[in-house]
Amino acid sequence: MKKTFTGTCLFLFMTITIVSCTESEASLGNEAKPAEIETETPATNASRIERGAYLVEVAGCHDCHSTKIMGPMGPQPDPEKLLGGHISGPATEKVDPALIQKYALFNHATTMAIGPWGASYAANLSSDESGIGSWSEEQFINAIRKGKFKGLENGRPLLPPMPWPNIAKMTDEDLKSIFAYLKTTKPVNNVVPPPTPLEELVKK
């Protein structure tokens, strides 16, 4: 009887020990495998360029920043000078001051606009050094976010009709994608003239 009791106790002790070891190993196994943290995969440059090209199209950047040639349905972007900005030189015509208090005037290429602010000319956004070829990504984002010429803190404000307050609502990734695409565009060597003050345009 005593032997039977002793054997039973030994069996129970061994069983408890085995279960305890198994649970400890399982616990160690769980500690060895920390929960995986999901991270956002950064966009590749190729995917950024592709998205940037799409955004430039749907945002209508060619409407003002690409000079036009006459096509069968009217003015259309000149494929040889895409995003090269205003090319025709500064405004020389005198305008009626009463007219520009009511209307904004555009040239046929829609790269120049005249209004109460004077005459503004669409910037060269091509990859040429006379465009944004020498710009940094930070400059480009600052230009859009803050409405500053060339993204410089002490730069002049961007003038109408540039809709920078709307574009500023794009995400950082959107703006980085646009910049990546613009850096791949055909370079258009074209120095855009500075804005013309209103007093130089008004008929005396």
Regions inferred by a protein language model and the residue ranges of each:
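Bacterial N-terminal signal peptides that target proteins for export
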Residues: 1-9
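C-terminal motif of bacterial Sec signal peptides marking the signal peptidase cleavage site
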Residues: 17-20
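Gly/Gly-Pro-rich "capping" loops immediately C-terminal to redox-active cysteine motifs
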Residues: 70-142, 158-171, 201-204
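The canonical Cys-X-X-Cys-His
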Residues: 52, 58-68, 140, 178, ...
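Interaction-mediating elements
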Residues: 49, 62, 155, 161-163, ...
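C-terminal capping alpha-helices of c-type cytochrome domains
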Residues: 134-149, 164-194
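Bacterial signal peptide processing site
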Residues: 22-24
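Electrostatic cytochrome c docking/interface patches
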Residues: 32-57, 69-75, 91-95, 134
